[in-house]
Each structure stands twice: as C-alpha cells, then as structure tokens.
Amino acid sequence: MEFQGERGTGPGVSSSSVACSQVTVSRELLTAGSEGSGGIWDQLLISSKPHPRKTSTLQTVRMQRSPLLDQVQAFLPQMAQANEKLRREMAAAPAGHFNIENIDETSGNIIQMDVALFEMSRSDSKEEDSPEESSRDSSGDSSESEEDVCVPSEVTIENIKLPNAEGGKGKIEILDSPASKKKKQ
C-alpha cells in the first residue's frame, strides 16, 4: 500500500501522486476483509455475483386456498343476480316507485338520518367578527344594508345555512314506531 496514515504534503510530493495514492487506498478499502472475493464492493453492487457458499435457491411454495376467497366468490354472483333483479324491477315499476324521497307509510320501518358534511368557513363563525361589523355595531347606525335584510326566498346551495357541526354527538329520534306506541299505551 502506497499511502498510509497522513498525507504527504511536502515539496517532494506532487498532487498527482497524492491523487493516485488515494485511488489505491480506496480500492484497497473496498476489497478489505475479503480474501479473493470482492469484499464490500460485491456486497454494495446490486448485480454482484452470488457468493459461492450461499447458493441457496428460492423455492416456490403453493399457498392454501383462502376461505375468504371462497366466500367472496360465492357472494359476487349473488350480488350480480340481485343487481339484475333490481334493474328489471326499476324498469317495470312506475317512475317514482324507487325514489327514496317519496315513501308511503306502508313501507315498514324506516330510518331517517339527517347528515351534513361540510367545512365551516371562518365567516360563518359568530366568535370572529370582522372589524367593519364591530365598528358598525358600535356606531349605532340604525339603517340596515341589503345584506342584513332577511327576505324569504327559495333555498339553494348558495344560501343554505347548515347547523353548527361543533354541537357534539348527533341525536337519534325514533318517530312513530310501533314500539313507541306500545309504551305510550
């Protein structure tokens, strides 16, 4: 090994000899610890040759059939048949028969859920008033702007006000069920 320990930086050592010795040291370090094989160099390379002692062949093993797969394969044809039956019933039934908004009282038990999913903007919160609103309130101006006047109109997506979602858990109410009628009697 040409270069060990400190670098030779004197008047007699040229920069080309220092560079050459660093390359030699790097190669020696990469092959260190391996007697004849490539050492760490072969371990770092992806396409390195397999070690002759570690010639283990990978074996393909057949996995057992999953019971879940059997259940899914049995269920999917049933679901396809049910979908086809529903399509035929929808084609044969009157227009409003499958409309979930229009139900008759003979349908049996019905669960009605009012679900609102939205992101509340900062302008909707009552805690944060803008400086203009607070100055207008403090000035005592009795004239109302067009925005403040509530005129009943058709409810659209733009003007609907949804309830505050921070109220906690939702409340489930049972309306006109046979069980509640029995309790009242």
Curated annotation (Swiss-Prot):
Biological processes per GO annotation: box C/D snoRNP assembly
Region described as Disordered: spans on this chain: 121-185
Entries under InterPro entries matching the protein: NOPCHAP1
Keywords, comma-separated and alphabetical: Chaperone, Nucleus, Phosphoprotein
Record has Phosphoprotein as a keyword: yes
Main location, first listed in the record: nucleus
A GO cellular component annotation in the UniProt record: nucleus
GO MF, one example: box C/D methylation guide snoRNP complex binding
One Pfam family of this chain: NOPCHAP1
Subcellular location: Nucleus
Residue positions where Phosphoserine is found in the record: S34, S66, S177
Entry superkingdom: Eukaryota
Self-association state and partner proteins as the record states: Interacts with NOP58, RUVBL1 and RUVBL2; the interactions are direct and NOPCHAP1 bridges the association of NOP58 with RUVBL1:RUVBL2 even in absence of snoRNAs. The interactions with RUVBL1 and RUVBL2 are disrupted upon ATP binding.
Function: Client-loading PAQosome/R2TP complex cofactor that selects NOP58 to promote box C/D small nucleolar ribonucleoprotein (snoRNP) assembly. Acts as a bridge between NOP58 and the R2TP complex via RUVBL1:RUVBL2.
Protein name: NOP protein chaperone 1
